[in-house]
Amino acid sequence: MTATAPTDGSTDTGLLRPHAEQLYAAELAELAGADDRPRPPSWRLSPWAVLTYLLGGELASGFTVSPKYVGPRRLVEVAVATLATDRALLLLGVPGTGKTWLSEHLAAAISGDSTLVVQGTSGTAEEAIRYGWNYARLLAEGPSPAALVQSPVLTAMRDGKVARVEELTRIPSDVQDSLIAILSEKALPVPELGTEVQAVRGFNVVATANNRDRGVNELSSALRRRFNTVVLPLPASPEEELAIVTRRVADLGVALRLPELPPALDEIRRVVTVFRELREGMTADGRTKLKSPSGTMSTAEAISVVTNGIVLAAHFGDGVLRPSDVAAGIVGTVVQDPVSDVACWTEYLEAVARERPGWADFYRACREISR
């Protein structure tokens, strides 16, 4: 795993977490130059080019576009096609399935701007979706366009861009419903100014929500009807998940300037195997049923465990990723509940890890951490 320079079409910006349109500016520029297909109004790229940007491919010039999302092609096609209509898009899935990652790259490819984001929380107010006021100017001048503070959604409406609403089901239900008029009428009344803002062609909304959040602030049927829903699955196979983890770890290594380590595919494969077996409640060979922990054991968490292990190996180890470097991260991810998860993890260690050939070092490292 190298951390010296980008190995794909990404651009080194020097930023800790550059936006997608900054990091992949070179790829977006190459795609725009090679794209001669019809583009929907206000789109930077055609749907074909957006799909190529997301899934990767080789252009006629020989330029290679790196894949941003690994998953069923048809789901991505449906997502892109939805945004070419007047229907909003809801990306639904368990934590760690890449919903936010995909929404960011969709906005970057379509609008060249992934920053028009409403981050949903239990404290999100209606102003975050509609508009607010600069109260100093409001008191001094009264309601005026200059005193109006645009929300990301309002900015997207005026500019014909894609707005993102993250964690939609965490937003209070009455605030969620402020989206209904925007999505159905494509207009936002501003009664204080006696006017309304009508959306420019190209405006749309991508929202994300976790399956496990359903019931916290359930979407109203009226709001749900305004969305086309695409359910993002967990990686279908161990090899697919391994490819995702390996690639994202390499990308993070470049972004964080982590020290260069020798390839550690076997150790990453072991982390992926542990996560998949605990998540699915069954060993990979189908012979042993397991208790699943209370956590999600997501791909995103596996990426975090491996990345943290690389830092431990580089700064406090011998420069090689070993079981002892990932053990603490795995235990911390599995054991969320001090009672049920401890029993689940102990069962896995004794029934699976202890008996599996080649896992003795991993078993000892995890037992040491679990004491």
Annotate the PLM regions.
Residues 314-371:
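C-terminal engagement/docking regions of AAA+ P-loop ATPases
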